[in-house]
A protein has these predicted regions:
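Basic, Lys/Arg-enriched alpha-helical interface segments
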Residues: 1-81, 87-108
Length: 108
Protein backbone atom coordinates (compact mmCIF):
# COMPACT_ATOMS: atom_id res chain seq x y z
CA UNK A 1 0.00 0.00 0.00
CA UNK A 2 2.17 2.91 1.12
CA UNK A 3 5.13 3.56 -1.07
CA UNK A 4 7.39 6.37 -2.13
CA UNK A 5 4.34 8.18 -3.51
CA UNK A 6 2.50 8.25 -0.17
CA UNK A 7 2.74 12.04 -0.03
CA UNK A 8 0.79 12.42 -3.28
CA UNK A 9 -2.55 14.17 -2.76
CA UNK A 10 -5.60 11.98 -3.36
CA UNK A 11 -7.65 12.73 -6.48
CA UNK A 12 -11.23 11.48 -6.12
CA UNK A 13 -12.97 9.76 -9.02
CA UNK A 14 -16.71 9.74 -8.30
CA UNK A 15 -17.80 8.88 -11.84
CA UNK A 16 -18.89 5.30 -11.17
CA UNK A 17 -22.62 4.98 -11.90
CA UNK A 18 -23.25 2.52 -9.05
CA UNK A 19 -21.43 4.76 -6.58
CA UNK A 20 -23.47 7.77 -7.70
CA UNK A 21 -26.77 5.86 -7.41
CA UNK A 22 -25.82 4.65 -3.92
CA UNK A 23 -24.69 8.12 -2.82
CA UNK A 24 -27.72 10.01 -4.12
CA UNK A 25 -30.15 7.48 -2.65
CA UNK A 26 -28.91 8.15 0.90
CA UNK A 27 -31.10 10.15 3.27
CA UNK A 28 -30.20 13.85 3.34
CA UNK A 29 -28.30 13.75 6.66
CA UNK A 30 -26.30 10.68 5.65
CA UNK A 31 -25.63 12.06 2.16
CA UNK A 32 -24.25 15.28 3.65
CA UNK A 33 -22.03 13.27 6.02
CA UNK A 34 -20.73 11.27 3.04
CA UNK A 35 -20.00 14.46 1.10
CA UNK A 36 -18.16 15.86 4.13
CA UNK A 37 -16.01 12.71 4.22
CA UNK A 38 -15.28 12.96 0.49
CA UNK A 39 -14.32 16.61 0.93
CA UNK A 40 -11.96 15.60 3.75
CA UNK A 41 -10.37 12.87 1.61
CA UNK A 42 -9.86 15.33 -1.24
CA UNK A 43 -7.57 17.36 1.00
CA UNK A 44 -5.49 14.39 2.16
CA UNK A 45 -2.38 12.65 0.91
CA UNK A 46 -2.40 8.88 0.43
CA UNK A 47 -0.22 8.48 3.52
CA UNK A 48 -2.84 10.35 5.56
CA UNK A 49 -5.62 8.13 4.16
CA UNK A 50 -3.71 5.00 5.18
CA UNK A 51 -3.22 6.30 8.74
CA UNK A 52 -6.60 7.96 9.37
CA UNK A 53 -8.37 5.95 12.07
CA UNK A 54 -11.75 7.49 11.20
CA UNK A 55 -11.66 6.30 7.58
CA UNK A 56 -10.45 2.78 8.41
CA UNK A 57 -9.04 2.16 4.91
CA UNK A 58 -8.72 -1.62 4.72
CA UNK A 59 -8.24 -4.25 2.06
CA UNK A 60 -11.21 -6.52 1.37
CA UNK A 61 -9.97 -10.08 1.06
CA UNK A 62 -13.39 -11.68 0.56
CA UNK A 63 -14.05 -9.91 -2.77
CA UNK A 64 -11.96 -10.62 -5.85
CA UNK A 65 -10.70 -7.46 -7.54
CA UNK A 66 -11.49 -7.04 -11.24
CA UNK A 67 -8.75 -7.59 -13.79
CA UNK A 68 -6.26 -4.72 -13.76
CA UNK A 69 -7.07 -3.73 -10.17
CA UNK A 70 -4.67 -4.78 -7.40
CA UNK A 71 -7.24 -4.80 -4.58
CA UNK A 72 -10.59 -3.44 -3.46
CA UNK A 73 -10.65 -1.45 -0.22
CA UNK A 74 -13.36 -0.45 2.24
CA UNK A 75 -13.49 2.89 4.00
CA UNK A 76 -15.91 4.52 6.39
CA UNK A 77 -17.87 7.17 4.50
CA UNK A 78 -20.44 7.90 7.25
CA UNK A 79 -20.80 6.73 10.82
CA UNK A 80 -22.93 3.79 9.68
CA UNK A 81 -21.87 3.20 6.05
CA UNK A 82 -18.79 1.99 4.27
CA UNK A 83 -17.79 2.62 0.70
CA UNK A 84 -15.62 0.52 -1.59
CA UNK A 85 -12.86 1.94 -3.75
CA UNK A 86 -9.52 1.13 -5.30
CA UNK A 87 -6.33 3.06 -5.77
CA UNK A 88 -5.18 3.84 -9.30
CA UNK A 89 -2.02 5.93 -9.01
CA UNK A 90 -3.10 9.21 -7.39
CA UNK A 91 -6.80 8.41 -7.96
CA UNK A 92 -9.20 6.94 -5.42
CA UNK A 93 -11.83 5.41 -7.69
CA UNK A 94 -15.06 5.04 -5.73
CA UNK A 95 -17.18 1.95 -6.48
CA UNK A 96 -20.11 1.61 -4.06
CA UNK A 97 -21.70 2.81 -0.85
CA UNK A 98 -22.84 -0.33 0.94
CA UNK A 99 -26.35 -0.63 2.32
CA UNK A 100 -24.94 -2.41 5.38
CA UNK A 101 -21.60 -3.46 6.84
CA UNK A 102 -21.69 -7.11 5.70
CA UNK A 103 -22.42 -6.31 2.05
CA UNK A 104 -19.22 -4.25 1.89
CA UNK A 105 -17.25 -7.42 2.45
CA UNK A 106 -19.25 -9.63 0.09
CA UNK A 107 -20.98 -11.53 2.89
CA UNK A 108 -24.54 -10.97 1.62
Amino acid sequence: MPGSDGNVRVILDLNNQTFQENLFSLQKTERHAALDTLSKIRQMTWQQVYRDKGLKWEKIFSVRAPQGVDAIYALRITQSRRATAFRDGPYMRMLTVAADHDSTYGKK
